[in-house]
């Protein structure tokens, strides 16, 4: 263990003495990709999430994110890991309203509400598939969901490396694609 102490003098901005100790893992360092996987929409063979009840409200794209992440996690060969040492970063398009909701009045929405299950609300939450993946693999580290934009790959890699420097052992990065989802497991080879 590497112990880091910090002290901010009394005349620093804020006017308070701020002391704190931060304990970092001595093994903290650069994480590398140790496994990659993909899940295509409509794929059925080798489903790592077969029979899961949670998949019914995630929608096709959300389920693809969870399945790609689970497949990559399995292929990484990680056996036992402290859940706090595992983080998840997801990249997606964000939630979209269902087609039946477009161009309808408030009255029509209320009337259709009785016919349609309110579980569709869960499908429009962009962070739900990433949170579900964290539950499935037992990750208790940071769970982040980012919106797709130009330059997002660099931002994701910076976040992964920052997590590695703070003592994180594993990060599962998942991304929604036009054909399904892709996932990468970042970690230290020696930690398996």
Question: What is the predicted role of each segment?
Answer:
Residues 1-192:
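Conserved "HGTGT" condensation-loop signature of ketosynthase/thiolase-family condensing enzymes
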